[in-house]
From Swiss-Prot:
Subunit-structure text: Part of the 50S ribosomal subunit.
Range of residues in the leader sequence: none
This protein's UniProt keywords: Ribonucleoprotein, Ribosomal protein
SUPFAM superfamilies: Ribosomal protein L13
GO CC list: cytosolic large ribosomal subunit
Protein name (record): Large ribosomal subunit protein uL13
Chain intervals for the UniProt region annotation (Disordered): 126-147
GO molecular function terms noted in the UniProt entry: mRNA binding; structural constituent of ribosome
Length: 147
């Protein structure tokens, strides 16, 4: 008997919604990356996009352990000499919290065309509202130990 290889037409995509309130950033990112890749499905294949859509709400209330809010830095470069800009995660969490969550999750996806396609199914919102009610997303609970 041959091993089943899923076809792109066979993939059934579900919508998951994750509330990021008081969830540690790394644990949230790893669970979301697994859903985006489709590793929770019995027909997962590493070369086919079998993942689901993931909506993350309350990204501004995500938890960080240790002193990462003050010490961890977000860097971006304009491409010009002297164009490096750094911002602490605390400042970024106050102004643009979706950036921190998106970067953490996309860093756990493959760094190729397939990873970009999987990352496009990620929707992150800083507050509790989102425009995806029509898709009827299923709540996904992240189980974590006490902090």
């Amino acid at each position: 008997m041959r091993t089943y290889q899923p076809k792109p037409a066979d993939v059934q995509r579900a919508w998951h919604i994750i509330d990021a309130t008081d969830v540690v950033l790394g644990r949230l990112a790893s669970q979301a990356a697994q859903l985006l890749r489709g590793k929770n499905k019995p027909y997962f294949a590493p070369h086919i996009d079998t993942g689901d859509f993931v909506v993350i709400i309350n990204a501004g209330k995500v938890a960080m352990t240790g002193n990462k809010r003050e010490q961890a830095k977000y860097h971006r470069h304009s491409g010009f000499p002297g164009g490096l800009r750094s911002t602490s995660y605390g400042e970024l969490l106050d102004t643009r919290p979706h950036v921190i969550v998106e970067r953490a999750i996309r860093g756990m996806l493959p760094h190729n065309r397939l990873g970009r396609a999987q990352g496009s199914k990620l929707k992150v919102y800083a507050g509790p509202t989102h425009p995806h009610q029509a898709q009827q997303p299923v709540p996904y609970e992240i189980k974590q130990v006490a902090q």
